[in-house]
Amino acid sequence: MLHGFTGSPASFAALTPPRLALAPPLAGHAAVPASAHFWAEVERLGALVPDANKLFGYSLGARLSLGLLARYPRRFDQAVLVSAHPGLRTDRQRDLRRTEDDRYIRLLRERGLPEFVAVWEAQGMWRSQDALPATVRADKHRERLTHTAEGLARCLASVGLGQMPDLRAQLAQSVCSVEFLVGGQDRKFLEAAQELCAIMPRARLHVAENHGHDLVLECPQFCSTFLARGPSS
């Protein structure tokens, strides 16, 4: 089970995970050093649980899960991926994204973690969380503050979306059963999931209407339902 950027294994506390599920912190989070690049982090995660055959990932964790499916095309039987992205298509798009991420990296290094978190949480992609109880939002805020500014900066610099290769060609060859979960209000990631379902032979799309990007936080029962299921045919 792979968490999102600024998250942690605690992000999954409200889910009902399978027995013996492992949820490692990702590179740059907690005390885990940042990996040199996207594939290095994929290979680090693959080595942690060489016998695992099921993946659950959210956002950054979903992107890394797609990397695992691409790197080890016959290893996994099933994946449940929330708000996944297969990577940007062109060098130009990746350059633009790296420029955007560089602003966050400078903010982390020059202004510190609390100011970065305030800016990060002000993004429109989290607006659907306004309806959540204040205690839930406060817990998420505290979780983000458990990291270090340098750790998150190095995470963005190594496995941010601008550092991720385009995985579409490799994923089109995947034999894994994949359930893509996405919020109906999260248009960018809904389009990405629709595209992935069109190219991956055993992929299915499930939309949580009236919800946004972080379905793990907003509707954990929806996510748990798919965690409990076996692979689709």
Write out the residue ranges for each language-model feature:
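Active-site glycine-rich loops that stabilize anionic/oxyanionic intermediates
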Residues: 4-7, 59
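Flexible "cap/lid" loop of the alpha/beta hydrolase fold
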Residues: 70, 77-109
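Short beta-strand/loop motif that positions the catalytic acidic residue
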Residues: 174, 180-182
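Catalytic histidine-centered segment of alpha/beta-hydrolase-like enzymes
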Residues: 208-220, 224
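Conserved alpha/beta-hydrolase catalytic His-Asp/Glu region
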Residues: 95, 110-170
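Conserved alpha/beta-hydrolase "acid-adjacent" motif
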Residues: 187-193
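Gly/Ala-rich beta-loop-alpha elbow adjacent to hydrolase catalytic centers
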Residues: 57-61, 65
